[in-house]
Amino acid sequence: MLIYLNSLADDILLGLYRIGKGREEEKRGEQELLVEMLCSEVELSHNEDGKPLVEGYHISISHTKGYVAIILSKKHQVGIDIEYRSERVKRISKRFLRSDEHFTETEELLTVWCVKETIYKLFSEDHLTYQDMKVDIQNKIAADVTKSRKVAFVIASTREYILTYAWL
């Protein structure tokens, strides 16, 4: 079920779709959301790294409990991530936080996790690690410290999830 569809800037489209449980529901939700976004059926494939591909578009897809989110553009590289709210992020924070990132609250940790996933997808060809990325939540800037690149990101959140996205 379509929850949200919006044109963000230029030719960038963002869509959010409610889905059921399981991988088949995720696939069906992706296809249905793409039809809503592009007003026609398109072939969705994946490269050897698992990155989604739609001919003529830069695309990024994310799933979480009950949702699929897609951002796409003809001109801009894009990245997106959505995460269901959970305390689990506190247990895994050491995996994605740098030693100079001192976040402890669930909201901050979920945001940093989402942003790093978004940036990873944005620069997927570079195969960044979580340690290669530094997040400034207050200024909504993420940095790829390996190449001194900085990217602005957007945060959208509800009681159920946190969604982040970015484009170049």
Positions of the model-derived regions?
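Core catalytic alpha/beta fold that binds nucleotide/phospho-ligands
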Residues: 1-168
